[in-house]
Amino acid sequence: MNTGGRLIAGSHNRNEFVLINADENARIRSVQELSGQTCQICRDEIELTVDGEPFVACNECAFPVCRPCYEYERREGNQACPQCKTRFKRLKGSPRVEGDEEEDDIDDLDNEFEYGNNGIGFDQVSEGMSISRRNSGFPQSDLDSAPPGSQIPLLTYGDEDVEISSDRHALIVPPSLGGHGNRVHPVSLSDPTVAAHPRPMVPQKDLAVYGYGSVAWKDRMEEWKRKQNEKLQVVRHEGDPDFEDGDDADFPMMDEGRQPLSRKIPIKSSKINPYRMLIVLRLVILGLFFHYRILHPVKDAYALWLISVICEIWFAVSWVLDQFPKWYPIERETYLDRLSLRYEKEGKPSGLSPVDVFVSTVDPLKEPPLITANTVLSILAVDYPVDKVACYVSDDGAAMLTFEALSETAEFARKWVPFCKKYCIEPRAPEWYFCHKMDYLKNKVHPAFVRERRAMKRDYEEFKVKINALVATAQKVPEDGWTMQDGTPWPGNSVRDHPGMIQVFLGSDGVRDVENNELPRLVYVSREKRPGFDHHKKAGAMNSLIRVSGVLSNAPYLLNVDCDHYINNSKALREAMCFMMDPQSGKKICYVQFPQRFDGIDRHDRYSNRNVVFFDINMKGLDGLQGPIYVGTGCVFRRQALYGFDAPKKKKGPRKTCNCWPKWCLLCFGSRKNRKAKTVAADKKKKNREASKQIHALENIEEGRVTKGSNVEQSTEAMQMKLEKKFGQSPVFVASARMENGGMARNASPACLLKEAIQVISCGYEDKTEWGKEIGWIYGSVTEDILTGFKMHSHGWRSVYCTPKLAAFKGSAPINLSDRLHQVLRWALGSVEIFLSRHCPIWYGYGGGLKWLERLSYINSVVYPWTSLPLIVYCSLPAICLLTGKFIVPEISNYASILFMALFSSIAITGILEMQWGKVGIDDWWRNEQFWVIGGVSAHLFALFQGLLKVLAGVDTNFTVTSKAADDGEFSDLYLFKWTSLLIPPMTLLIINVIGVIVGVSDAISNGYDSWGPLFGRLFFALWVIIHLYPFLKGLLGKQDRMPTIIVVWSILLASILTLLWVRVNPFVAKGGPILEICGLDCL
C-alpha cells in the first residue's frame, strides 16, 4: 500500500481514518505535487503566491485547497483541513478569525484583508459556490473520509456541472436530497458584478427556466465523473483479493470496506460477573439445601417428604440444564455501510450473494391468504438487488385459493414494490403499514408522496376486496372440483393425490413493475403427493423447496419464514449478509437466526405469547457458545450447511513436541492411550468429511487438476454415483450441489430446468437417499427445526443470533389460551419424539464439533416436557398438606430458616440480574414464570403421553396448524377460552388448592391460635400455586373472560373425587383406630 510517506491513523470507535505526514520531506514532496493541481473543493486551479510557489492551505498534509475556499472555510466552516482535520493556521494576508493564536511575526493589520496579487475580497466570494456543511444535510463522514487527491464533494455537498464554463459554477442537488441532479445557482467567480443566488425553495421544479437547457443530467454527470476519475490520483491497495486492481475507490473507503462487517459486544462485566458469582453461590446453597432435606425426613409423612425431595432434585437438574448455557451471553452489532463499501461499488454489478426465500403454507382457511400475500409482498419489496432475490411459496395443501391469491399478489406487487423503494417505506407489508398508527409523513420530503400514498392505499383496498372475494368463493367447493380458466381440472382437487405443480409468476417472462423495473422471481410450488408415501409434513415441503430452488436459481443462502411472518425491516437480508459474507468469520456460520416478534398482542401479554425471556435471555446466552438453536422461522441458512457438509476447519500450527525424551516419559502431559483415543476420533471426523471433500475433488477433476496416473473417467463416475446416491437422481440438481458459491449451469434452457424441477418434487425422489437423514430438514419429529439445527452444530458449524434495532420479522401470535396451549403441545411433542429417537443429544453426535455447553442446551430442549410429571405432583402437594395437616418438611430450625431464605433470595436475585443484562421487563419475566407452570401441567403433560403412545405403541397424532389471526378487531378473541381438554388439569389443580386453603384456614380457626404457626408454611405453598395459575382464576371469576362451563364442571367433579378419595384412603391415619371400652357412664 502506497501511503505517500504519510502516517496512517484512525479511530475504530469514532469510525475515522486519516493520513498524516510522517516527516518534513514527505510534506515538501506533497507541496511540490500541488503545482498545477486543482482545488478539491471548487475545482479551480490553485494559484501561485508572490514567491511563485503554489498556495498551501494546510502545512501538515498539503491538501489541495485554493485561497478563496481556504478563506471561506476559516470564516464560515469548521476551520479545519478536510483531510487531516488539522486547524487551518492563519497565513500571510489572511484576515483573523476567532480562535487564531496571537502571532506578531506574520504581518500587520494593514495587510489583513489583502490577498497578495489576487485582489479578491470576501464580498466577492460566491455564496452559491460554498455553503457551510452544517446546513447541507449530509453526514460529516462523507467529507472527513476524503483521501489526498481524490474527488470530494463541494462545501455545499453538491456536484460540478461539466457543461458550465470554467469561470461559472453550478450547484447540483444530489439525488439523495430529492433534487434528481438538477442545476441551480449559476454564479460567476470572476465577475464581481454577479450577485450570489439563494437556495431554491422547490428543488424539484423544472430548472430549464434558469437558462441551462434540458440536456439529460445523468448523461452529463456520468461523463464528468469519468473525466474526473481519470485526472484524480487514486491510492490503490495492492494484494487485496476483495478489491479489483482497476477500482477507483479512495483509500479511506477501501480501508473501511476491509474492516469486519460485524462485531461481538460482550455484556458489561459489572452486570455479568455478579450474575455468574450468584450462579455459583446458588449451586452451593442447593447443595446445602439438599443435604439438609435428605438428612431430615418427616417421620409422620414420609411419603410426602420422599416425593417432594425427588421433585426438588429434578427441578434442580432442570435448572442446571437451563442455567449454564447462559454463562457467556453476548450481543452483536452489524455495519451495513461496510457491507455496501465492500460488495456494492458504483458503476459495477452488486457483489452481494443471491438469496432464495422460502414461504410455507398448508391450509388457506387456517392461514388466511391475505396474510400470506402480505408476507410475499414484503419479500418482493426487500432492500436487496432484485436479480438476487427469489421467493418460493410452498403450498402443501395444493389449494387453488392459494394459487389464485398468489396470482393477484404478483399483479399488485407491480405497483407496491416501486412505491416502497421510492419512498423507503417501513414495514413493507401493506396491511401493517396502512393500519399502524404512526406519523407516516416523518422524514418524507417529496410533495407527491401524500398523493401517491392515498392512491396506493386505495389500490390495496381493492386488492383486499379481490382476495376476500376469492376466500368467499372458496367456501363452496364444487362437487366435481375446481377448474382452470380454460376448463382444465385443477390438479390439486385431491389434496392427498395430485401431481407436482410449479408456476413462475414473476422474474421469468420479462414482467416488470409499473416503472419498468425488474422484479424478483416469484415461484409457486406444490410438491407431488400420492397415497402410500410418507410426506414428512413441513420438513418434506422445505426439502422440496431446497431442490426446486437448487435447480431454478441455486442461491448460496436461503431464508425460511412462515406464511404469517412478514419482513418488518427491509434491510434484514443485509443484516444477515454482514455475518455470512464476512471474510474473517463467515465461512463457519451455518445460519443466522433472528428473534420472533409479534403483532396483535396486548401490552399485558397474559399468556406470554411474546416469549421475551427465551429470545432476549436464553438465545443471547447460546450466541456466546456455538450459536442459537433454529426456531423454525426467520432464519437465513447457508445452503452447503443444509446439504450436510462439515464446517471448514482452521489450519493449526505445528505443535510443540518433546522428541528429546523417551516415549515412556510423560513430560508432555499425555499418554499413548490418550493419543490413541485422539487418533480414533480424528479418523472418525475424517470419515465424516469425506462427503464434503467429494464435491471439491469433483470440481478439480472437471477443471483438469488431477494427479498423474489417475483415471479421470472412473473417478468422475464413482463420485457422480456417490453424489446421486446422496442427493438423488437429478443430474442438474447434483451439478448445482457441487457449486459451493451457488450459480446456474450455462446454456440451460428454462424448459429443461422446469422439467428437472418437477422431477425433484416427485414422491419417490427421496427414496434411498440421505434427504431427511443427513441432508436438509431432518425427519423424525414434528419440531424439525431443533433436529435440523442440532445436525448442523454437530458437523462443527456455528450459528449467529442477530437482533437489529428494528425487528427483522414480525408474525401473528395465537389469539387465545387454547390455541397457545395447542402450539406449546406441538413443540413439546416434538421434543419428546427427539428424546426417544436416535438423534437424542444425550447420546448422539459425540466426536463431532458440538460443544458441551451447547449440548446441554439441546438436552434441555428435549428434556423439559418430562418436568411436567414432577411439576403436577409438586403442585398437588400443598392441597394434600392442607387437607391432612401434614407437611413436606419437619419443624424448621434456625439453620433451616437461613437455608430456605438464602435459596429463595438467590432465585429472586438471579431473575433480577437476568432481567438486567437481558433488558427484559419484570412483567415479561413474571408472565413467563406463570406460563411455565400453566404449560407444564397441561400441554407438556399431554405431549408426554402422546409422544410415548406414538413412539412405543405406534399411535400417530395429527399435526394441527395453529390458526392465524384474522382481522376481526383488535384483541377480539385474545382472552376467549375455547373448549379443550388441555385446560382441565390446571383448572383441577387450582380448585384443589383453593379447597385446601379454605379447609386449612377453617381448621386453624377451630383449633385456636396454636394452629396458625404450622399453617403458615402450607398456606404459602398453596398460594404459590394459585398465583401461578391466576389466569385460570380470572377466567373462572371474570365476566368478560369467563371459563367455559364444561371445563369448570369437569374440574370441580375431578377435584371433588380426588378430595373424597384422599379422605377415604388417608395414609396418615392409623389403620387400627382407638380401642373402645365400657366406661359405665350413660351418655345421651
From Swiss-Prot:
- A Pfam cross-reference name: Cellulose_synt
Q: List the disulfide bonds.
A: none
Q: Which residues form a coiled coil?
A: 450-476, 675-703
Q: Which GO terms describe its biological process?
A: cell wall organization; cellulose biosynthetic process; cortical microtubule organization; multidimensional cell growth; plant-type primary cell wall biogenesis
Q: Where are the zinc fingers (RING-type)?
A: 39-85
Q: How is it modified after translation?
A: S-acylated.
Q: Which residues lie on this side of the membrane: Extracellular?
A: 299-300, 890-894, 952-980, 1034-1042
- Residues found modified as N-acetylmethionine: 1
Cellular component per GO, a single term: cellulose synthase complex
Give me the reactions it catalyses. Answer: [(1->4)-beta-D-glucosyl](n) + UDP-alpha-D-glucose = [(1->4)-beta-D-glucosyl](n+1) + UDP + H(+)
Q: Which residues are glycosylated?
A: 958
Question: At which positions is UDP-alpha-D-glucose bound?
Answer: 360, 366-367, 396, 537
The UniProt note on the cofactor reads as follows: Binds 2 Zn(2+) ions per subunit.
Q: Which residues form the active site?
A: 396, 785
Residues annotated as binding Mn(2+): 538, 562
* Keyword Glycoprotein included in the entry's annotation: yes
Q: Which Gene3D superfamilies match?
A: Spore Coat Polysaccharide Biosynthesis Protein SpsA, Chain A, Zinc/RING finger domain, C3HC4 (zinc finger)
Q: Where in the cell is it found?
A: Cell membrane
- The primary location reported for this protein is membrane
Q: Which family does it belong to?
A: Belongs to the glycosyltransferase 2 family. Plant cellulose synthase subfamily.
Quote the PANTHER family the UniProt record gives: X-BOX TRANSCRIPTION FACTOR-RELATED (PTHR13301)
Q: What does this protein do?
A: Catalytic subunit of cellulose synthase terminal complexes ('rosettes'), required for beta-1,4-glucan microfibril crystallization, a major mechanism of the cell wall formation. Involved in the primary cell wall formation. The presence of each protein CESA1 and CESA6 is critical for cell expansion. The hypocotyl elongation is based on a CESA6-dependent cell elongation in dark and a CESA6-independent cell elongation in light. The transition between these two mechanisms requires photosynthesis and PHYB, but not CRY1.
Quote the protein name from its UniProt record: Cellulose synthase A catalytic subunit 6 [UDP-forming]
Q: Which organism is it from?
A: Arabidopsis thaliana (Mouse-ear cress)
Lineage, highest ranks first: Eukaryota, Viridiplantae, Streptophyta, Embryophyta, Tracheophyta
